[in-house]
Regions:
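Conserved N-terminal substructure of TIR/SEFIR domains
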Residues: 1-62, 146-162
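C-terminal interaction surface of TIR/SEFIR-family domains
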Residues: 4-6, 105-162
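Conserved beta-strand segments of the P-loop GTPase G domain that flank and frequently precede/overlap
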Residues: 8, 68-71, 97-98
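Short catalytic/ligand-binding loop motif for oxyanion handling, primarily in non-cytosolic enzymes
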Residues: 14-17, 76-78, 102-107
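Short, well-structured hydrophobic secondary-structure segments
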Residues: 59-71
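Conserved TIR/SEFIR loop-to-helix hotspot centered on a Trp-containing motif
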Residues: 73-89
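A short helix->loop->beta-strand "cap" motif at the edges of active sites that frequently abuts
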Residues: 90-94
Length: 162
């Protein structure tokens, strides 16, 4: 089944690495969502938080899975956490992918980020739940993401019942 995937990542810092992942996905006749032209992102930032939320909500529409591309500073990004929380609340499949091993435009790799995004919701007893407790995380380089990303997405979708 074809999946439409939302990609969440630290835009300013990791766009090059994120494009490597996205391009590997779309070359296999699949659809990516949540990628914006730099001018759209900058325009939304100028308009404020509500404009950014609206842009994210539009990107999440009709997606079954959200893939969080984890770079060195991703876990501290307000909007990535918002994307994770919305995806979790909506019952989408979720997964994390470490992208530090992908070379940037200058041929450099980066330090590994972490997947401690903070509380993403609560369980039936009102206790906090965290991304790392519920969702799998893969390493693009070590786990052969180019070959396996489609399988990771499918597993996340099935786990979410989608």
């Amino acid at each position: 089944m074809a999946r439409r995937v939302f990609f969440g990542f630290h835009y300013e810092r990791d766009i090059w690495r994120a494009n490597v992942v996205r391009n590997s996905w779309v070359t296999k006749d699949r659809e990516a969502a949540g990628f914006w032209d730099a001018s759209l992102w900058e325009e939304a930032q100028k308009k404020g938080d509500e404009a950014i939320k609206k842009m994210i909500e539009e990107g999440l529409k009709n997606t079954t899975v959200a893939a969080v591309l984890i770079g060195k500073e991703t876990s501290g990004r307000k909007w990535v956490l918002y994307e994770i929380r919305r995806s979790h609340e909506d019952g989408k499949g979720l997964l994390g992918v470490y992208i530090h091993g992908i070379e940037d435009s200058n041929g450099n790799t980066d330090q590994k980020g972490d997947n401690s995004f903070g509380e993403i919701g609560t369980d039936a007893n009102g206790k906090p739940v965290y991304f790392w407790q519920l969702y799998p995380t893969y390493d693009w380089a070590d786990d052969k993401g180019y070959d396996n990303f489609g399988d990771w997405v499918e597993k996340a979708a099935k786990k979410a019942g989608r």
